[in-house]
Amino acid sequence: MDRTRIHHIGIVLPNRERAEQFMDIFNFQVDCEEYVEAYHAQCIFTKCKDQEVAVEFIIPTEGVLTQYNNGKGGIHHIALQVDDVEAVRKEYEEKGLKMLEEAAVPGACGIIVNFMRPKYGAGILVEFVERLHEDSV
């Protein structure tokens, strides 16, 4: 796997009000917001002064994410930025490690993503993020 860095921490929340409360407490601002059809969720990427790693709030509208942590939400995943999500998928699958998707899917705000199944990541859901252009999150 080529260059990696922590891109963001994903937090599932049951509603927008909870995300706004969190942002108010910690002085986060919305950097980019977009609905991700593949996961039926409104995704809000944040920024904060001197913050190198983004926080992504995931507000599901339907599907399995609505039941995450019994519907209360919580820290969901850690995301690693890579140069080529598809190359990462192939590399790990050659080692017998499976991803959630057969191919990368569109994420919010100019990225494509895929997730390594938690059983291969020491119980942690790891997302791989590829930025599609310079102004992607």
Model-derived features with residue positions:
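Vicinal oxygen chelate
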Residues: 1-2, 6-14, 35, 44-49, 55, 66-91, ...
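Long, hydrophobic N-terminal alpha-helical segment
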Residues: 1-39
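A cross-kingdom feature marking solvent-exposed beta-strand/loop segments within repeated
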Residues: 6, 38, 61-70, 74-76, ...
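Short, structured motif recognition centered on aromatic/hydrophobic residues
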Residues: 6-13, 23, 46, 53-58, ...
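Short N-terminal helix-initiation segments at or just after the protein's N-terminus
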Residues: 15-28, 59-65, 89, 124-128
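Short loop segments at secondary-structure junctions
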Residues: 16, 49-51, 61-62, 83, ...
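Beta-hairpin (beta-strand-turn-beta-strand) motif
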Residues: 60, 78-85, 104, 131
